[in-house]
Amino acid sequence: MSALISQYQNSKRSVTNMSKKISIIGGRGFTGQELIKLIDSHPQFELAQAFSSSVAGEEIIIDERKLKKTYASLDEDTEFVEEDAIILALPNNEAAKWADKISKQNSQAIILDLSADHRFDGEWHYSVPELTQTIDGNKISNPGCYATAMQLMLAPINNMIDGEVNFFGISGYS
């Protein structure tokens, strides 16, 4: 989310009192639900759409509060022309097809991919927003949990280290 804020603060577009329209593809999952909460509570963001194939048509309820919006259905005819940003909160191997469609329909929209689909794609900016102040372009690939933890841990001492740094992470759940 802070990547979107940084992008708007540092972009050529002016930041005004107007709210920025943000859609979430994958709005019903855990991450999508948290994003809906963040967007709903932010004074400059407006939830344009939350897409979910599993609960399309159902009311969006956050912390027992109804948002007066319903989850939208996502299909090949869906258009993304009014959004300022679209967040892809989809599983790996699902986000790429929607990113291409969004780029063709709305070349100005910021696309934030939370999956691994674009992490090694040179057209996408791979960024830990807390460590990156400016972003060139509108395609942002969010690092995964291990990469984020390791980069944040290393950041304060990075200038004191000579040579190569290696990290090894193990999880009991994936």
Task: Give each language-model segment a name.
Residues 2-174:
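N-terminal Rossmann-like NAD(P) cofactor-binding subdomain of oxidoreductases
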